Amino acid sequence: FLLDVRDNKEGQKKIVSSVLSMCFIQSIIYLLFFIVAQNFITAEYKYYLAIDVVLNVFLSALLQFARGIGKTTNYTVSSFISATSNICLNVLFIAVLRFGAEGMFLATVLSKVVTILYMIISLKVVRYYAVHLFDKSVIKQIAKYSFPLIPNQLSWWVVGASDRVIVSKVIGVAANGVYSIANKFSGLFVSFYNIFNLSWTESVSLHLDEEDSEKFLTETINDMFKLFTC
């Protein structure tokens, strides 16, 4: 949506304000549900889970904001900051301070906080956000686009969470080890495709209304199939 208004500052502000306001609303609703349901959750580190979900909501929104306004450098640097701070904090909390499992969760949360702060400062999000610019029609358009993607994301989450458990139970732990190693190779392939897909989707959005868009799309799709099926 931001790609369509890349040259329209007011349009960008309206979209960013609407999305971030919706993130606040979603986070409040989620935390209210968590407060009600927390007595039924026996996990020792359930509060870290609640915080992590809220941080993920805002981090995802800010990452897409960076891509939408063409700040690919900030997008890349934020990923580096997230990974680096996570590793350093894990070493500090687990190896040095001996916090154990709690240190791992704390490191994850703090690394996301650091990344979010970097994104807010480097992208100057404050200049794009204003409560009065919240637009229900923008949210409806985004929801209309997003809802069909939910089953797909849930399916991938179920597969990712259950495949190793099923392999271990049905075939055995040794087979699960082989399966995990094999997944590393496919994971590398998927990572390569994801890098290509980031630039590809942006190019499609930017050139969709041009006269030679059909030729551009056809050639790119053909080349993509040749590359990833060879």
Model-derived features: where do they sit?
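Helix-loop junctions and terminal segments of transmembrane helices
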Residues: 1-7, 182, 186-225, 229
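Membrane-interface helix-capping segments at transmembrane helix termini in multi-pass transporters
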Residues: 5-17, 28-54, 97-105
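Alpha-helical transmembrane segments of multi-pass membrane transporters/permeases
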Residues: 10, 51, 56, 66-91
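Alpha-helical transmembrane segments of multi-pass membrane proteins
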Residues: 24, 36, 40-66, 80, ...
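C-terminal transmembrane helix end/exit motif
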Residues: 35, 63-68, 72, 94, ...
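Interhelical loop/hinge segments that connect adjacent transmembrane helices in multipass membrane
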Residues: 47, 101, 117-161, 199, ...
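Hydrophobic alpha-helical transmembrane segments
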Residues: 47, 78-126, 186
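Interfacial/gating helices of multi-pass transporter permease domains
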Residues: 101-104, 141-145, 149, 167-187, ...
